Amino acid sequence: DTIDVYFGTEVPDPYRWLENDTSAATAAWVEAENKVTNAYLAQIPFREQLLKRLTDLANYEKIGTPFKKHGKYYFYKNDGLQNQSVLYVQDSLDGEARVFLDPNQLSDDGTVALTSLSFSNDGKYTAYTISRSGSDWSEIYVMDTATGKLLEDHINWAKFTGAAWQKDGFYYSAYDAPAKGKEFSNVNENHKIY
């Protein structure tokens, strides 16, 4: 057991060993906890009714606040049970909306999320970040705003960042690629601004 001392006060930390998230002991502990949790959840007699009710409550159209960029109007919309909201664009307030970017099309299981969006100063390009399966790691892509065509390059190992445009490029922060097997273990240190 680990005990830290803060200003003369001992603070036990009996679960510090769980911070080693790739150890066999941590994996065994997680497996045992999952077994207990799943056994409890499986025995709830009204579980299916609860799921149906929650699904019914979540199944309504959701529309985000519109925003204007370079003379066009953008807004997010979810038809009800879509995994991710879709970004739409329209040329005027009463114009017809069309899909600008649909993150649901970026994976089969709907777990790719659009995490940030930034337009170049002239509006020609759109930089956006995505994360996969709830990870803090992001990838940055740049597309032609008018055509939706992706530029060739994209950036991996970004985290907690978006694109800050300046003239014909943008700033962002990223990390060195983590060692294989340590993708979800690294602390947030030594990020770089590009």
Residue locations for each model-derived region?
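Beta-propeller folds
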Residues: 1-194
